[in-house]
Amino acid sequence: MPIHLAIINPKSPENMGSILRAAGCYQAQSIRYTGERYARAKAFQTDTKNVHLDIKVSHVDEIICKITDTKLTKVAVELVEGATPLPNFIHPENSLYIFGPEDGSIEQGIVDQCEHVVYIPTIGCMNLAATVNVLLYDRLAKTTQMPVDDKVIKNSRDTNNRTKAK
């Protein structure tokens, strides 16, 4: 189930570092972003797992490409009236998840191009990186392709973790 992330004008290097790590953990195929703020923030080296070596990360002028995105289902993730609560959402097979900036919202014109709009039903708005993590976890939790053995644990845990459940 291909996953692509689109971040509109990301601001915080810490958020982008967390988003990169989440993209690696949840096996996203690509991350695209608009704006110039992240290019300046990259100097802070927040990609501690070097995810950018495995996942295509690219700057784009337009968050939705009318030519290449025709096979992707576009999903805006935003606190928008009329949006579907994430717990009730069925994730499409090939998805482009679009997230707004930390200090703004997704423009109406972009929302209008999306097949779905979802929101996370919390009290107050969430941090951008937290929103990406929750959405990606929700997608994983609703899939039938989850591993059920210890192999994923052994491959994912920190090198100092050798703890076992009884």
Question: PLM features: what roles do these ranges have?
Answer:
Residues M1-E78, L140-K166:
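RNA substrate-binding interface of SAM-dependent RNA methyltransferases
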Residues E14-N15, T84, S105-I106, M126-N127:
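Residues that form or flank phosphate/diphosphate-binding pockets in enzymes
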Residues G17-S18, G109, A130-T131:
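Generic recognition of short, well-ordered alpha-helical segments
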Residues C25, Q113-K151:
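Structured adenosyl-cofactor binding patch, chiefly the S-adenosyl-L-methionine
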Residues E36-Y38, P101-G104, P121-M126:
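Short, acidic/turn-prone active-site loops that include or flank metal/cofactor-
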Residues K42-T46, P87-F89, A130-T131:
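Short secondary-structure transition/capping segments
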Residues E62-I67, G82-A83, C125-N127:
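A short acidic, often aromatic-flanked loop/helix-cap motif at beta-alpha or helix-coil junctions
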Residues V80-V118:
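Active-site/ligand-binding-proximal alpha/beta "capping" segment
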